[in-house]
């Protein structure tokens, strides 16, 4: 028998305490469940506390349920990388192409849904941090992602706990583990 549809307002009322920093995600449909056909569906709240760029080998589908978020992306095919910010407003959807470095910035009282395709067997995810001063990669970690609910958080925490990993080898700047107050402006809630 198939499970019932997930009512987002009711789920948030009963489970919003599960959306905790640094990632603030909760997998409502886990790929290990036979009912999901390998897909991962997460509810993600804000504010999150991360500055990493994640590279997934499959596309990611974003639906912004409440408020606006900012999806920071990086084109690493050029040096230095070219950065582009993509606002995703309430009620909007966005399909991020596979292998695009991205940093989802979520603000207070915002909620989104992210859906990811099943990853090919032994596909390697990458998380990396860029230097704000010179644009070089400060640190990166590659791993086979089997549980988005825990592994991304673990890598973010590993980076945050080690100043050597956070120090740019090119210029010596120490990378921040979260954006500073006022550093990133929340896009307007609704498009005018």
Curated annotation (Swiss-Prot):
Matching HAMAP family: 3_HAO (MF_00825)
Residues reported to bind substrate: 60, 106, 116
Pathway: Cofactor biosynthesis; NAD(+) biosynthesis; quinolinate from L-kynurenine: step 3/3
Protein encoded by which gene: bna1
Enzyme class at the top of the EC tree: oxidoreductase
Binding site for Fe cation: 54, 60, 102
Binding site for O2: 50
EC number: 1.13.11.6
Name assigned to this protein: 3-hydroxyanthranilate 3,4-dioxygenase
Keywords linked to the UniProt accession: Cytoplasm, Dioxygenase, Iron, Metal-binding, Oxidoreductase, Pyridine nucleotide biosynthesis
Keyword DNA repair: no
Provenance organism: Neosartorya fischeri (strain ATCC 1020 / DSM 3700 / CBS 544.65 / FGSC A1164 / JCM 1740 / NRRL 181 / WB 181) (Aspergillus fischerianus)
Catalytic function, reaction form: 3-hydroxyanthranilate + O2 = (2Z,4Z)-2-amino-3-carboxymuconate 6-semialdehyde
Localization per record: Cytoplasm
Lineage: Eukaryota, Fungi, Dikarya, Ascomycota, Pezizomycotina
Residues reported to bind a divalent metal cation: 131, 134, 168, 171
């Amino acid at each position: 028998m198939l499970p019932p549809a997930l009512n987002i307002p009711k789920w948030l009322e009963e489970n919003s305490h599960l959306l905790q920093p640094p990632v603030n995600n909760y997998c409502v449909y886990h790929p290990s469940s036979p009912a999901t056909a390998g897909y991962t569906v997460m509810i993600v709240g804000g504010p999150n506390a991360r500055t990493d760029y994640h590279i997934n080998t499959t596309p990611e589908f974003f639906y912004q349920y409440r408020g606006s978020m900012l999806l920071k992306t990086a084109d690493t095919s050029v040096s230095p990388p070219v950065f582009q910010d993509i606002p995703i407003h309430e009620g909007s959807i966005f399909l991020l192409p596979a292998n695009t470095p991205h940093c989802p910035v979520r603000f207070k009282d915002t909620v989104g849904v992210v859906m990811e395709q099943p990853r090919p067997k032994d596909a390697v995810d990458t998380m990396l941090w860029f230097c704000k001063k010179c644009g070089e990669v400060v640190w990166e970690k590659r791993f086979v992602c089997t549980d988005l609910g825990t592994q991304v958080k673990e890598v973010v925490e590993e980076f945050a706990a080690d100043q050597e990993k956070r120090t740019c080898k090119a210029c010596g700047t120490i990378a921040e583990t979260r954006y500073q107050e006022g550093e990133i402006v929340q896009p307007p809630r609704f498009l005018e």
